[in-house]
Amino acid sequence: GGTPFSCYPAMMKQRGDRFFTEGINNTLLHVYISQPSEEREPGMNAWFSSEFNRLNTWYPQMDLFTSYLKRVNYMLQQGLNIADVAYFIGEDAPKMTGIVDPELPKGYQFDYINAEVIERDLFVKDGLLTLPHGTQYRILVLPKLETMRPELLAKIKKLIEDGAVVLGPAPKRSPSGESYQTADRQVEKLAGELWSGLDGRSVKAVKRGKGELLFGMTMEEALKHIGCVPDCGLPADAPVLYGHRAAVDADIYFISNQKDETIELRPEFRVRSKQPELWDATTGRIRTLPAYEETAAGTVVPLKLYPYAVSYTHLTLP
């Protein structure tokens, strides 16, 4: 937004950092237009996007910004993303995103997941919903929709019986015209088997096989019910966003101050027996953080974040 040529890296950084906490880990410059003339400034340009080219006033300093982006991309490509919750986006028209409902409390991360991945890839390992590459989730959340194909509902039933935890309402019919009426009866039968005795008011949780089905709970209630403490404990009003990657020998927490003011906080990371280090994505410097405290749930690390600053808290084996 804004007037033409008014956007500069300091403005882009805050928004970019927010996207990094949402899972983006491979950035590009949009747009970079070739400039054939030395005399005409600002040169050839587009009416959309931001201008990255040699006639831009801040081009001589742009390497500071691109070096920052490269460091962030590299760190966020290490290991696996840590998210406790997978929100199923439903089976409506194809979509790239979904909604977060029930709302996720601060200190937890989530992924969206679609029907294809659930049916083809998702399985249960050690009581956790697991994907073939290793990513795991504590809870699968179903959207507040009345439709689900019987094949997908059968797979979700198997996941629960194998040990998964699923939160959400019962579907009533199939969204597909395939096997019309027969599919609706299959959905009704499967839903009856799963949600029987679960009204979301007096009864909000039922065991099914090795797993559990929840209904009528907030995310706070559901996470507490399964004993899942925050991955990054933060004050509810802290203007901070975070992301977490787990590599072979280290946990990497990306902490972003989204406000134009200096803040001090004491995040509690759900990691123990590791030495915290501060990896500065702006300068590339690394330093050990000696002032930390281990708790029953994790590690508390005092941090001071300058306006719109980012902290990589890298916890590694001593």
Identify the meaning behind each predicted range.
Residues 1-315:
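Carbohydrate-binding surfaces of carbohydrate-active enzymes
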